[in-house]
Amino acid sequence: IGELFSIIDNLITLHQRKSVTIKKLKSGLLRKMILTVESTLTDVFLPLFTIDWEQRKLGELAEIVSGGTPATSNPEYWDGTINWYTPAEISEARYVYGSQKKITEVGLNNSSAKILPKDRTILFTSRAGIGKTAILKNDASTNQGFQSIVVKNNIDPEFVYSMSTQIKEKAERVAAGSTFSEISGKQLGKIILMIPGIKEQQRIGELFSIIDNLITLHQRKLFIIAYIK
């Protein structure tokens, strides 16, 4: 039995190391990509990326949409079919498919919550714990703890999600100047990003999606092995 548990512990350690290594690879690629583009230097290590990028405000690339909460005292507003997210539901997963709580059409219409379109929306938490992100895979709404990024038709959501670390860092710097750590939709829309053409956006988004899938795979294996133990 002792030998069996030793094998399981070794498997856990192995997948933890793999997960950490892949996360470091992702972080390093992002930094290298941004530095290469911003310095306008060709980098043979990243042949995927050109230097033909331009500076754009996030608000030019997407609509920034806030959320709201229907009155909790009215049962007609709750337990419906409309996804309604809170920041606590956003973790490290690249995609989200369904929320813990649902609201009704009546609840939606009697609050400042709005329907956000699937596949084009990146949820972005805007209060303490700023910058947790996820791509919607089903239409949804959120509470007021978000400033969601709904990308325009010529912008790839996978690419914008891949830039979320950079967006988060800039958003935190903006929020640090306020009494309560929060970023408004107007402030978020003013954040500057470097962006390539749509085809290159798609290639970059696909690359980082593959990396995130690898991270998720090892995290799932860790969960299963720990559960078996």
Predicted regions and their residues:
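A short beta-sheet element
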Residues: G80-T81, T86-A88, Y97-T165, S184
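Amphipathic alpha-helical segments with low aromatic content
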Residues: I1-E54, K199-K229
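Proline-centric
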Residues: I1, F49, S148-I155, Q187-Q202
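Specificity-determining recognition surfaces
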Residues: P70, M163-L193
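Short beta-strand/turn micro-motifs at beta-sheet edges
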Residues: K32, T133-L136, A176-S181
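Structural detector for helix-capping/boundary residues
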Residues: V44, R56-G59, A88, V106, ...
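Non-catalytic DNA-recognition/assembly elements of restriction-modification systems
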Residues: P47-G68
